[in-house]
């Protein structure tokens, strides 16, 4: 009996989060079919989970950005600027693709919001005015009211100032960042229970139409990611290496993307990417920096997630978006994506920042985050696969172009697969 309990506890604490979320998803559907009152009652679990996310997200953004900027090392001579440019170009292109696809195939979410609470901006001028006012907000006020734009502004400013701090101070900042990340991981471990409550109460209240809407949203998300992985990224790589990019693209998807799909963490996939770069005989001084950096800031998949879910919320609430505002959303989504920082589900926690552009209240934005967690079993896995495989793809493209030595048609021909 004790052995059985030990195995069960080990599965709950250390088991696969993907499997647990799937179990919660199925259990929520079954409960909604069996007992509508019970399904509505367990909606409390979903509310508590979303509330915990709402509480921890502002602190997470603040500490991750401060730690990242404060610990940037000077004097590292590498050819990283071209790779950094590709990271930025790829992330912005992904957000742009997501905007276009979302306009062609708009998605609708099940949200609980009163139209009186929504004050949409009239155009790009009002959006910029709101952004500027958000930037100069009091930092404590920004944290209390989940003003993510103000939080980002203060985090960047403090991070730059703390780059000149003593090593002990930087170590303390790193420890604080790690502590907040640990809290986030603990909260996310409760995702199966939260999703169980969200799915059960949603189906009980709205019927299976909600799942069909989420299925459409998932198709749009995965479709955008496939479009970026198989069309946009190859075009960028071809522009850099001037030859058929698909052998390199497919090698990166095969060697890096598959493992990242299951780990659901760009940071956890860094050793795999490092080994792949080594087998392709790339410049070690370059990839030893670009791969960890890419795990933090190269977030094409996150940009897609933020953009698609934000525009889905906008469409659901009936807010009209003009072209300049949509382009600005692409920029904001690309910047937001850089804050995902390799944490599983991290991009979902940054959706409220993009939603704030359109006057969407934080409570409604966190409902969008809840929707993201419902579809996150596939969404987060596909997002991480795109993010991590793009790290090694762009690093290899720049290294091969700058070495002026084009590799064999199969970039891993000289060595076996990882």
Swiss-Prot record:
Its main location: membrane. Gene3D superfamilies: Sodium:dicarboxylate symporter. GO terms for molecular function: neutral L-amino acid:sodium symporter activity. One of its GO terms (biological process) is serine transport. It catalyses: L-serine(in) + Na(+)(in) = L-serine(out) + Na(+)(out); L-threonine(in) + Na(+)(in) = L-threonine(out) + Na(+)(out). GO terms for cellular component: plasma membrane. It is a multi-pass membrane protein. Keywords: Amino-acid transport, Cell inner membrane, Cell membrane, Membrane, Symport, Transmembrane, Transmembrane helix, Transport. It is found in: Cell inner membrane. The keyword Cell inner membrane applies. Belongs to the dicarboxylate/amino acid:cation symporter (DAACS) (TC 2.A.23) family. Involved in the import of serine and threonine into the cell, with the concomitant import of sodium (symport system). NCBIfam families: PRK13628.1 (NF010151). This is Serine/threonine transporter SstT.
């Amino acid at each position: 009996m004790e052995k059985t309990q030990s195995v069960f506890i080990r599965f709950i604490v250390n088991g696969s989060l993907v499997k647990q979320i799937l179990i919660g998803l199925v259990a929520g559907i079954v409960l909604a079919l069996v007992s509508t009152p019970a399904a509505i009652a367990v909606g409390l679990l979903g509310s508590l989970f979303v509330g915990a996310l709402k509480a921890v997200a502002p602190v997470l953004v603040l500490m991750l950005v401060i730690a990242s900027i404060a610990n940037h090392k000077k004097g590292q001579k590498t050819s990283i600027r071209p790779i950094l440019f590709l990271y930025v170009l790829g992330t912005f292109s992904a957000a742009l693709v997501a905007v276009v696809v979302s306009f062609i195939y708009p998605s609708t979410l099940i949200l609980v919001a009163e139209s009186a609470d929504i004050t949409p901006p009239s155009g790009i001028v009002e959006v910029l005015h709101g952004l500027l006012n958000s930037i100069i907000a009091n930092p404590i006020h920004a944290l209390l009211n989940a003003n993510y734009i103000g939080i980002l502004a203060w985090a960047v400013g403090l991070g730059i100032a703390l780059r000149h701090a003593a090593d002990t101070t930087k170590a303390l900042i790193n420890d604080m960042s790690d502590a907040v990340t640990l809290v986030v991981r603990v909260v996310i471990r409760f995702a199966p229970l939260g999703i169980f409550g969200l799915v059960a109460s949603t189906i009980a209240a709205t019927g299976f139409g909600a799942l069909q809407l989420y299925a459409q949203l998932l198709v749009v998300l995965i479709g955008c990611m496939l479009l970026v992985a198989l069309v946009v990224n190859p075009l960028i790589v071809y522009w850099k290496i001037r030859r058929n990019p698909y052998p390199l693209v497919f090698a990166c998807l095969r060697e890096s993307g598959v493992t990242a799909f299951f780990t659901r963490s760009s940071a956890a996939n860094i050793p795999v990417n490092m080994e792949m770069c080594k087998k392709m005989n790339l410049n070690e001084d370059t990839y030893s920096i670009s791969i960890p950096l890419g795990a933090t800031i190269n977030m094409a998949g996150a940009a897609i997630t933020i953009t698609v879910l934000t525009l889905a919320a906008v469409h659901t609430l009936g807010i009209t978006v003009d072209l300049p505002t949509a382009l600005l959303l692409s920029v904001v989504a690309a910047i937001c994506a850089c804050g995902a920082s390799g944490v599983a589900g991290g991009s979902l926690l940054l959706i409220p920042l993009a939603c704030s552009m359109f006057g969407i209240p934080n409570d409604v934005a966190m409902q969008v985050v809840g929707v993201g967690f419902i579809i996150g079993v596939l969404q987060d896995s596909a997002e991480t696969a795109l993010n991590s495989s793009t790290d090694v793809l762009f690093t290899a493209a720049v290294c091969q172009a700058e070495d002026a030595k084009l590799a064999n048609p199969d970039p891993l021909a000289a060595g076996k697969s990882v």
